[in-house]
């Protein structure tokens, strides 16, 4: 009887080891995914900052062109 109990215990221990091994593999996969996602977030953040700078530059250029256009229209009205 105690041999059967020992076999059952051994089977449960082996099942626990297998479960732990699978969970460790899953943890490694999730760590890799997390690293990849962090990299993507950093890239997106960098892209966002670049777009904000470009947007500001374009707004400044638009303002300069509007001022030039107003000046030209003012000269045309004078003539």
UniProtKB/Swiss-Prot annotation:
Pfam families reported for this sequence: ZapB
Swiss-Prot/TrEMBL keywords: Cell cycle, Cell division, Coiled coil, Cytoplasm, Septation
Main location per the UniProt record: cytoplasm
Keyword Cell cycle part of the UniProt annotation: yes
GO biological process terms, semicolon-separated: division septum assembly; FtsZ-dependent cytokinesis
InterPro entries reported in the protein's UniProt record: Cell_div_ZapB
Coiled coil regions, renumbered to chain: 4-78
Gene3D superfamilies registered for this protein in UniProt: 1.20.5.340
Location relative to the cell: Cytoplasm
GO CC annotation terms, alphabetical: cytoplasm
Quaternary organization: Homodimer. The ends of the coiled-coil dimer bind to each other, forming polymers. Interacts with FtsZ.
Function recorded in the entry: Non-essential, abundant cell division factor that is required for proper Z-ring formation. It is recruited early to the divisome by direct interaction with FtsZ, stimulating Z-ring assembly and thereby promoting cell division earlier in the cell cycle. Its recruitment to the Z-ring requires functional FtsA or ZipA.
Recorded family membership: Belongs to the ZapB family.
Name this protein carries in UniProt: Cell division protein ZapB
């Amino acid at each position: 009887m105690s041999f059967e109990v020992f076999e059952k215990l051994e089977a449960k221990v082996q099942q626990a080891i297998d479960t732990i091994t699978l969970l460790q593999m899953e943890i490694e996969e999730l760590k890799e995914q997390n690293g990849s996602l962090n990299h993507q977030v950093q890239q997106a953040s960098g892209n966002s900052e670049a777009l904000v700078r470009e947007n500001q530059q374009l707004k400044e250029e638009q303002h300069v062109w509007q001022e030039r256009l107003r000046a030209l229209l003012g000269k045309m009205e004078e003539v």
